[in-house]
Design a protein with these regions (language model features):
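A carboxyl-terminal module marker
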Residues: 149, 164-176
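Catalytic core of carbohydrate-active enzymes
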Residues: 1-160
Length: 176
């Protein structure tokens, strides 16, 4: 049913966007695909559902964005004249309703100067995150490739207040 909705779209298997297309609408009904990890509000980290039909309040100043539990989203500060050099400012980690271990192989964090072929000399940095969630503990483990540096000294990690975050490998890059 999720794929038959005309006013809802998936950015990928982990993020759903439900724009409000009708004036004066205060609530929308959408179908979320079932997942054990659960679906969460992007802005508040509030748990929504593990799937099925849900009704969401839609304030005028917010587009509903729903994120699957256990998702890691890097946020960039875009430099318009050189977008490939946009430094990662923040990483958002979403909780999960179940104990899980996820390796987001499709989401490595790549740090490169963007101008040279130094990556061929291993002068870039690739961090592939693995997220492990147990009760209210979120383990963030990075597989590190290369000897390059991140564009910023520190990257902010954003996650729910009631969750304890444990970093393994590369913790010197992050501010909790």
């Amino acid at each position: 049913e999720h794929f038959t909705q005309e006013e809802v779209f998936s950015l990928n298997e982990r993020i759903i966007v439900a724009p409000v297309l009708h004036q004066h609408k205060k609530k929308i009904n959408i179908f979320l695909p079932y997942c054990d990890e659960g679906w969460f509000d992007y802005f508040s980290f509030k748990f929504i559902s593990t799937g099925g039909w849900v009704t969401l309040e839609v304030p005028i100043n917010k587009i509903p964005i729903i994120v699957r539990g256990g998702t890691l989203i890097p946020k960039l500060k875009v430099v318009f004249h050189k977008p490939h050099l946009a430094p990662i400012e923040e990483i958002i980690l979403f909780p999960s309703k179940i104990n899980i271990a996820i390796t987001q192989k499709n989401m490595p964090l790549i740090f490169d100067d963007g101008d040279t072929n130094d990556y061929q000399k291993n002068k870039n940095l690739i961090l592939t995150p693995k997220i492990k969630i147990e009760k209210n503990k979120l383990f963030l483990i990075f597989n590190k490739i290369g000897n390059g540096k991140a564009q910023k000294e520190k990257i902010i990690l954003k996650y729910p207040n009631n969750t304890k975050l444990i970093l393994k490998n590369c913790s010197n890059y992050f501010i909790k």
